[in-house]
């Protein structure tokens, strides 16, 4: 047995091969800045290959130890393992591990190091003494490799050594656990971080009223203790990820110039070299016309079922006017068709489970994304399909949950989940089949396994902002131009492909500032970003992606002999902000079609929402922008009041059990049955499409105040029980709000006869 004991600070990176995994295996242990490190197997031409997984969990190891076995059937000794680590914070670097073989192998393997991936230095040789015998090794690297920001290591056959085995080309060389260690020691260059870029740009007049200031530096940074930014008189808390610092802000005013400031010395590198100049950025949120206030047209379940809501929207006479459907928290099932059927793969007829939207301008608004779950009813009949068990209505256009037809343009979804009823691994279980144009999804979730979302209009434009798209196989696929802004892509299980774009309108699938996560850790290093569904037309571009679960090193996959117009990335990073190595990304599709998998900075910057979707002035980001949060919220007994806002369509008033009611006035009387002094109540503002934003809370007062005998009210205002102001002298049950000279207000509920 061979045992190594290290302090956590010694590790640069390591693979113990305990958990399953082969082909572009992420490091099992790593130091800061090495969370993007992978171990790969290459052939003599540098192409990536897989290996036989001999991990402890997958195979019980190889001859008593976990490892990775080559097991290729051609080119004995032509394949080699390689990795690249960031050793910029380490000196006295060493690599240790073990190797063995079975069946056939060269008996000596060299361990080599390189600073550029071209010129290699042999640091030691592993001479294996017979089949099925582990040989341990430890090699110290020369000082020239100290503090190397890019240090490559490879394990390659010494073809001058003897071979052992049956004489065939089947290679049984096995790599055991690897530990790359060093002595932590940063190199202090004495230079402060340099600000390379920032958002919004200086002088920008198109910023959001709620967003974030983004500062990008030339090296990894940290904030000085207590350092904060300042904007509109408010202190902004920083968030640091690698080389980037962000400052979230909210509730700015449209069309008003602001200046963000950050004092000198607030940002420093990891050796405490601090910036010497203050940062100042002037920008102006875009202008926006005031919006008309209106209540929801249909509330589910208050006004009826989900089927009733869709029927009402479809039956309205004026389809140019937006119809807003609101769903309280709950689970809802679209009804089966009463007169249409679909033929299952078993040849039988089943009631059509798909709901069809044929009219434009409908908003589907939920109380909360997790709280509102909408699905359909599919038969629970499973057959043996081409790729395993499959629902009889699997397939595009058969068991879809929701289908937007060509005329259903301008539909809007927010704060809800559309979910497949088929279950995982039951074939193509489409949640949204979109044949329309200008659909917007904001902070919503599409939940399925394969072909979750199908953009089905070559001339269509579609926009996603925030929210979750979940699946395993081609779970965003199809035609047209789709802009995914800050969406969380959730990868299910092992393997799979996120996207399968086909024919674009012009720009294809653009993923900007998105995040990729695994439903479990099994996804890490085992999926790809997409594959081309077509010949020479598919486009998928990932820009500024945070890959909490990393794809395979090659990044992309083949599909039915197709090839892309472009499948590429820019600035893909790990959760810690470590840049992901894109040099191994797939460059050839269908054997002969070249692909440049890396975007330039200028290319990436061009793909804005405006450039991709705004040819006719369509601005989905402004449409989806959340209404300003409520300000001035106060409680006067049963009555809540707050500042009016002309960019809010309505307000939702919330109690401890959810939404109590809605209003288009900046006040609301809580019904007696829902009121309790001391409880917390909240108000949420809706944007022009009806989507609700964050809740602002207040603690309710009793409404009974002591008033001294010599105090006189300077103002008295009367309201009815609906919170609408009425004239003095009105009859009925009224709310009297008195304001006194000292600023106090007293609210009294009274009966006026």
Predicted features and spans:
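Surface-exposed, low-complexity/disordered Ser/Thr/Gly/Pro/Asn-rich loops and linkers
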Residues: 37-89
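Extended extracellular/luminal ectodomain segments enriched in beta-structured repeat modules
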Residues: 87-96, 148
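Extended, low-complexity, turn-rich repeat/linker tracts enriched in Gly/Pro/Ser/Thr and Asp/Glu
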Residues: 89-91, 100-107
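Terminal, low-complexity interaction segments
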Residues: 120, 124-186, 265
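Acidic, Ser/Thr/Gly/Pro-rich low-complexity segments and short DxT(G/T)-type signature motifs
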Residues: 188-201, 253-254, 264-289
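Short, surface-exposed alpha-helix to beta-strand junction/turn motifs within ectodomains of secreted
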Residues: 209-240, 268
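Sequence-level preference for short, compositionally simple segments enriched
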Residues: 289-639, 646-652, 658-698
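C-terminal outer-membrane/trafficking sorting elements
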Residues: 655, 701-753
